Amino acid sequence: MWRQKTSPTAEPLALEEAKLHLRVENAEDDALIGALISAARESSETFLGRMIPERQFEIVLDRYPEMPYRLPLLPAKSVESVVCTLEDGSEVGLTEGTFRLAADDRLVVDAWPEGTPRTYDAVTITVTAGTETVPARWKQAMLLLIGHWYEHRESVNVGNIVNEVPQGFEMLLWPDRVVPS
């Protein structure tokens, strides 16, 4: 399980970029468009298996993982801390130098602490993950979603022929998708 510790400081698309794509000139729908930008980013992150933009997360594991441990949040930029909770409830933070971020977003721990780990929430890893730059393809995919959601605000489209935008969202993101191994 993982949870976000810090929120994005900015979205990968500016409000003005989305409004230009939507051909919206007034400020009446700015709050809605801002929410659509966030939702499109989150959908893109889910599809890609990558975080956009960089921020901090906690990964909580129920046992000591096998090494090297492939971090589920990509791309991993740094590992700030690794804290182990033992059976008696005490917490042991691994010291700097006993763990490291290796190639391919893998965490390497030289040695786990003495003692039996707790059977749930045994390891908490604090990691910074995310992209610094967003490729144009990713932005275009997000704009396609935003445009679709802005025009179709209900979950059912009645009275129209429904079809997928040819070569749309998935085609733009597919080359950079990370499939868990």
Identify the meaning behind each predicted range:
Residues 1-181:
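Divalent metal-cofactor coordination and adjacent catalytic microenvironments
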